[in-house]
Amino acid sequence: MDDTNKIIYAFVTYTLLMLVYTAINIPYSALGGVLSGNPNERVSIQSYRFVFGMLGGLLVTSCTLPLVKWFGNGNNEMGYQLTMLVMSCLGVVLFLICFRYTKERVSNPPHKLSLKTQLHVLWQNQPFKILCMAALVLLTSMVLRTTLAIYYVKYVLGKEDLITEFVTLGMIGNILGCACAQPLSKRLDKKAAYVYLQYISAILSCIAFFVPNEHVLLAFLVYFLWCFFTQMATPLLWAKMADTIDYGVWQNGLRLTGLVYASIVFFIKLGLALGGAIAGWLLAYYQYQANVELSEATKSGILTSFTLYPAIGSILVALIMTKYNLDNKTIKKITADLTQKSNL
């Protein structure tokens, strides 16, 4: 197979992989809204989900190259193929176990409404629209920053040999942040906590802008704290999705679980794409070229793109979420009303 056909093959198979994965991930994500009707338990569910998901990511990152070496025995091409095959089979088994042994505790009565009607009804759900906008801006700014992390370490800090340590430290911060979401939600209103966390993320991003290049340990610490506080908000966001579903039931009697999660996941995927694209556009704008000595202006552009632009994104998310009207008091009322109706 020549190089052109290899590229076409890689593009087609990767696109199909993402389509299938998204088709699996939407009902998997929606499980968080039907495993429990308790808003606090939903935060706990999402915390466990993201902690173990990120641990899995860390495990894959750590094990991939050793497995490639072991399976390939000198043939890296064969090593990668067999490693991906093993990981894919393991993923399928884990998905099957998940769907086989989870039990939905929130009923989702069937209805015969057309997709057009469902979308019209969903568009009346104001909290849902707020979450869509917040998810889009949030993921765009997060992906922008994480994409540029390696460029920041290599060109701004001048420590290419520490890229792996920098990224790994960020992943550890992500895991610890997700684990702390549940204790935080018990002490603060979920809406207020989410807004505060966005402002903290913005402040930490701005602090990173002023960290001198020679203070590598401080740069690592600030990035760790940014990952910690940013990811602490992630389980709260996913728990809020279930709250907007309950709001829709309370508002019009329709539980559109699948459509809500599918729609918000669409905006999340759009944010992922935009964040990666904007990172590339900014690198081009600041005249980045690989494997050459970069000008101070280019390095300054990378620093600004890694710190200040994501900070603006976090502030925008916080401002958007101030319009979100489902605080803990409102959610408790909605939950009580729905429980009373279900008992009639």
Pin down the residues of each PLM region:
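Membrane-embedded alpha-helical bundles of multi-pass transporters/translocases
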Residues: 1-344
